[in-house]
Amino acid sequence: MYYCGPNYGVNNLAVGFRCWDASFDTKLTVPYVIGVASLKESGVRSSYSTPGSSLWVSGFGGEYGNNQSYSGFPVVGGNNPALMTTDQSSCSAGYVRTGIDVGTGLNINSFQSGSHPENQNCNYTSTANGTSAATPTISGVIALMLEANNNLTWRDVKHILAATSEQIDSSRQKTY
């Protein structure tokens, strides 16, 4: 599986994969490769996710994890949830530190502030995102498929993914 990060550079499982229109990447034309795009919570393409006809499936990767402002100020861009996952222990390590607003020094993500009743020790982050989050989700789905039937071929896997997926974001204006 290949994924594309928001930095428009190499950020993947294979050196050389680029992050503009996925249709231009010849690696995605290999039949046993599954190109994965990212969706946000509303079921439309994430702002950073690569478009292209060579993508096979989308998984939830969210946006940037902004939520209720801990500082009392509105969050720029509104609510943009990402994925919830475990993080390094403590409020001074891991991704929980990314909720700090550089300008004010205040934590702008209430879940990662240490004051949220379900995350007082900051053992979880709500800002895991991107196609690098969507791809492992799809890999997990494939692992469950293969656990249920280990005789599936790569063609079977791709067929099941296609047959059980639904088209998303079809009415959105194309910007590429």
Per-range role (PLM):
Residues 16-143:
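Extracellular S/T/G-rich loop segment that most often corresponds to the catalytic His/Ser-adjacent loop
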Residues 1-18, 174-176:
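Short, flexible/disordered intra-domain loops and linkers
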Residues 149-176:
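An often Trp-containing, charged/polar helix-loop segment at the C-terminal end
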Residues 144-148:
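Active-site catalytic microenvironments for nucleophilic, acid-base chemistry
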